[in-house]
Regions:
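Helix-rich terminal scaffold detector
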Residues: 1-157, 172-177, 181-183, 193-224
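Reductase modules of NAD(P)H-dependent flavoproteins
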Residues: 2-16, 166, 344, 355, ...
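Transmembrane helix-loop junctions at the membrane interface of multipass transporters and ion channels
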Residues: 7-19, 191-199, 226-239, 245-262
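Non-transmembrane, juxtamembrane loop and terminal tail segments
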Residues: 55-89, 289-308, 484-505
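Classical protein tyrosine phosphatase
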Residues: 55-61, 135-139, 168, 172-185, ...
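Alpha-helical transmembrane segments and their membrane-interface exit regions
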Residues: 141-145, 220, 268-278
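Transmembrane alpha-helical segments that serve as helix-helix packing and pore/cofactor-lining elements
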Residues: 152-172, 222-239
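Ferredoxin-reductase
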Residues: 288-394, 451-452, 479-481
Length: 570
């Protein structure tokens, strides 16, 4: 079968019909992007109705045989749901590199096929129709792409009861699909120009070159969005990403007038989100303290009462931190050390809140980046917060999935909770540990915390009850030694699990070795043969992989697991 498309000469009426067809298929592509979220809502409503009917009183019972058959069929289907969900949530590894999760690949392949079908259907033999269709279908996805990236007003996060850091996975998937379609669009147009002998004439025409410039910017955006680049310098990725987000829309707006509706949508939601984020950001006075004997700093910021109440109601949430002009380094407003903080908004998990004093506390490990280094430079070695000098910090939040689903965790009948943390991942785990114990006193809650040295736990020694968390029988600390917890690399969020020699530590610390996650998980499930189990983790990649691998056999046996991995991998 040969190439079906040809260079056709169309009449004005045929060109008009082609334009109508382009707009029609672009609208379909644009609106259909909301279908997955709507389908999710529909399934959730169906499940809610099914549960309410099954728990309701039936005045006239149906046939026992038919009823039993229906219940067996429904039970089988519903029983496979958690297994399928777990399978889709598994990571994909290829040649030692992480390639996202299975659900990203499934959705990405399906969505690519759908958009390619919309790009091809109805084009006939018209080569330029196919070329233009690829471009406008790709552009119709840009508002969705921007929506998926929003932090404060992300509608997909609202519908899916998630948070932007999880939705951002699909932002990356859709970005690659758009890039793929626009690459095909550019290749086909270049072939047309070359075959028609007008490449030099058309390539540098303003309307065409605007598209070329936009494509170059998109190359830079996708290049810096690669995982290796983000790990080497998140700062470069973020700055290029932000500048590209502003540069690409006006270039496409000029290049393709038919796409202006979608470009306007994209810019509108992006600017609106920035405005909302600006309004919810608090400039708070804060005390920054260095924790002696560690590379940790503890930040205690004084927040307005309404804000601190919001954070207190959402345990395990995180904030975005920005250093305002008053607290920045540099000799002037145009110096590089000063300007770099215009682009830095780093995530930190809220370790604790105190509604009486209005204090919000988070902990950071000093690394090679400018943000944690600036916090270290601002820190005071004294532990006397009253005498320490206060600095201004911009705090935006709260964010995080767990804050939205915490009520489900409490009310869903879960009887056993296992929380695993590595290093400063305990800033996520400890507030949840206290909150679950406070809200669900009958649940058995266990906290596993792996740290490099006992000094790394000093910031968490106090609890809302006044009793040290280190004296809690349900909290197990594992000291991994100097080689245990993360170094200064970006991947090292908590602990690299190696054995260490015995040493004298706090009386509550009984484990001078790496945690045996397989045994811990097996014991958790064996002690609760019929109970629902919640497992939450915040730590380095290797810890999360080992924990999930240990849980997988139990999920495949049909155990109901409420799983949450708190990570900042975007």
């Amino acid at each position: 079968m040969g190439w079906p498309w040809e260079f056709l000469t169309l009449t004005d009426e045929e060109k008009h019909q082609r334009r109508l067809s382009l707009e029609h298929y672009a609208y379909i592509a644009h609106l259909s992007a909301f279908a997955p979220a709507l389908l999710f809502v529909l399934l959730r409503l169906i499940n809610r109705v099914r549960r309410s009917r099954s728990s309701g009183y039936q005045q006239v019972p149906g046939s026992p045989t038919i009823k039993a058959t229906q219940q067996r069929w429904i039970s089988r289907v519903m029983g496979k749901g958690p297994m399928i969900k777990w399978w889709l949530g598994e990571d994909v590894w290829f040649m030692g590199s992480h390639w996202g999760q299975r659900d990203e690949w499934v959705l990405g392949i399906v969505w690519t096929a759908w958009l390619l079908a919309l790009s091809i259907h109805g084009t006939g033999k018209d080569y330029l129709h196919l070329t233009k269709r690829l471009g406008i279908v790709a552009t119709s996805q840009m508002p969705i792409q921007y929506l998926l990236a929003l932090k404060a007003i992300n509608p997909f996060a609202f519908v899916l009861r998630s948070s932007h850091e999880h939705i951002n996975r699909y932002h990356r998937v859709l970005g690659r699909i758009i890039y793929f379609l626009l690459t095909l669009h550019a290749i086909l147009y270049n072939v047309f120009f070359i075959e028609s002998g007008i490449w030099f004439k058309r390539f540098f025409a303003p309307i065409v070159f605007a598209g070329v410039a936009g494509f170059i910017v998109m190359h830079a955006l996708n290049g810096t969005a690669m995982a290796r680049v983000r790990q080497q310098s998140y700062r470069v990725f973020f700055i290029v990403h932000l500048l590209s987000a502003f540069a690409i829309p006006p270039l496409i707006y000029y290049h393709a007038p038919s796409s202006r509706f979608y470009i306007g949508e994209a810019i509108g939601v992006f600017v609106l989100d920035l405005a909302v984020r600006k309004m919810i950001t608090i400039t708070a006075p804060a005390v920054v303290e260095a924790i002696p004997g560690t590379s940790l700093v503890k930040v205690s910021a004084t927040m307005p009462s309404h804000k601190i109440a919001t954070y207190a109601a959402r345990p395990g949430s995180h904030i975005y931190l920005n250093v305002p002009p008053a607290s920045r380094p540099g000799t002037g407003q145009f110096s590089a050390p000063y300007l770099v903080f215009e682009f830095l908004y780093n995530p930190f998990t809220v370790a604790s809140t105190n509604q009486e004093t209005g204090e919000l506390t988070f902990v950071a490990r000093t690394r090679t980046g400018p943000m944690t280094n600036r916090l270290h430079n601002l820190s005071s070695s004294t532990n006397d917060g009253a005498s320490a000098e206060k600095v201004e910090l911009n705090i935006e939040g709260p964010y995080g999935t767990i804050g939205k689903t915490f009520n489900d965790l409490i009310t869903s009948g879960i009887n056993r909770v296992l929380i695993v943390a590595g290093g400063v991942g305990a800033s996520f785990a400890i507030p949840l540990y206290h909150a679950v114990n406070a809200e669900n006193s009958i649940a058995h809650v266990q906290l596993i915390w792996a740290i490099r040295s006992a000094g790394d736990a000093t910031w968490a020694s106090s609890t809302p009850t006044g009793k040290s968390i280190l004296d809690d029988d349900q909290v197990q600390l594992f000291l991994t030694g100097d080689m245990g917890v993360a170094d200064d690399s970006d991947n090292a969020a908590g602990v690299e699990m190696n054995d260490m020699a015995q040493q004298t530590t706090h009386p509550a610390v009984r484990n001078n070795k790496r945690p045996d996650l397989q045994k811990i998980v097996d014991d958790t499930f064996r002690k609760s043969q019929q109970e629902n189990v919640a497992i939450m983790v915040c730590g380095p990649t290797e810890m999360v992989r080992e924990l999930r691998k240990s849980v997988t056999p139990w999920v495949m046996k049909g155990r109901n697991v409420w799983w949450h991995n708190e990570s900042f991998g975007w």
